[in-house]
Swiss-Prot record:
InterPro entries: Ribosom_uL1_bac-type (IPR005878), Ribosomal_uL1 (IPR002143), Ribosomal_uL1-like (IPR023674), Ribosomal_uL1/biogenesis (IPR028364), Ribosomal_uL1_3-a/b-sand (IPR016095), Ribosomal_uL1_CS (IPR023673). It comes from Shewanella pealeana (strain ATCC 700345 / ANG-SQ1). Binds directly to 23S rRNA. The L1 stalk is quite mobile in the ribosome, and is involved in E site tRNA release. Protein L1 is also a translational repressor protein, it controls the translation of the L11 operon by binding to its mRNA. GO terms for molecular function: rRNA binding; structural constituent of ribosome; tRNA binding. This is Large ribosomal subunit protein uL1. Belongs to the universal ribosomal protein uL1 family. HAMAP family: Ribosomal_uL1_B. The keyword RNA-binding applies. The lineage of its organism: Bacteria, Pseudomonadati, Pseudomonadota, Gammaproteobacteria, Alteromonadales. Gene3D superfamilies: 3.30.190.20, 3.40.50.790.
Length: 233
């Protein structure tokens, strides 16, 4: 049998796999177990009561977390004219049309989010095979195809997270860094769950948010008792 690492032994000792923890206790555990040599992210997995095989039960969207994600986000915007100037003023690192598309085709991908105005989709559409697999393709549902590109840039910079359930009906995203205050992580999680509840498909029946687990980049998942979250009230 393979020998457990020191961190794995600590996780096994501290985390009860079948227990749902008070949110404050769960965050305290994550902080105690975050022993990596870099600043770990705090990630969340939300099991939804949906059938992901049915298109009318898939959940996709975006929300701005009140305390951001702790990441510096580089934004590329496809637009022109006055919108281009507005995007630059809002903080976008890359703004353009055909010349920006050429950079991407050449393999220059120095950005984390792509935003486009509707009139630019004729250019962006040709980049689907490059941006799509990386989860970067702009989409109206996530607010990344919009006539108000400046607002979208500000949202991305402010800590907007995009979410989409996977083939198992689970949402995976980040809610901050391990050095965030416990209250900040709690409020970010509550904001995400609130957004998910608003995005509940009409076709989804029964319990919608079935399980919530938080973890650090290198750590094990800790199940959260939803009753200890303000959003549950």
């Amino acid at each position: 049998m393979a020998k457990l690492t020191k961190r794995a032994r600590l996780i096994r000792e501290k985390v009860e796999a079948t227990k749902s923890y008070d949110i404050n206790e769960a965050v305290a555990l994550l902080k105690e177990l975050a022993t990596a040599k870099f600043l770990e992210s705090v990630d969340v997995a939300v099991n939804l009561g949906v059938d992901p095989r049915k298109s009318d039960q898939n959940v996709r969207g975006a929300t701005v977390l009140p305390h951001g994600t702790g990441r510096d986000v580089r934004v590329a915007v496809f637009t022109q004219g006055a919108n281009a100037e507005a995007a630059k003023e809002a903080g976008a690192e890359l703004v353009g049309m055909d010349e920006l598309a050429a950079q991407i085709k050449a393999g220059e991908m120095n950005f984390d989010v792509v935003i486009a105005s509707p009139d630019a989709m004729r250019v962006v559409g040709m980049l689907g095979q490059i941006l799509g697999p990386r989860g970067l393709m702009p989409n109206p549902k996530t607010g990344t195809v919009t006539p108000n590109v400046a607002e979208a840039v500000k949202n991305a910079k402010a800590g907007q997270v995009r979410y989409r359930n996977d083939k198992n009906g689970i949402i995976h995203t980040t809610i901050g860094k391990v050095d965030f205050e416990p209250a900040q992580l709690k409020e970010n999680l509550e904001a995400l769950l609130g957004a998910l509840k608003k995005a509940k498909p009409a076709a989804a029946k029964g319990v919608f948010i079935k399980k919530v687990s938080i973890s650090t980049t290198m750590g094990a998942g800790v199940a959260v008792d939803q009753g200890t979250l303000d959003d549950a009230k």
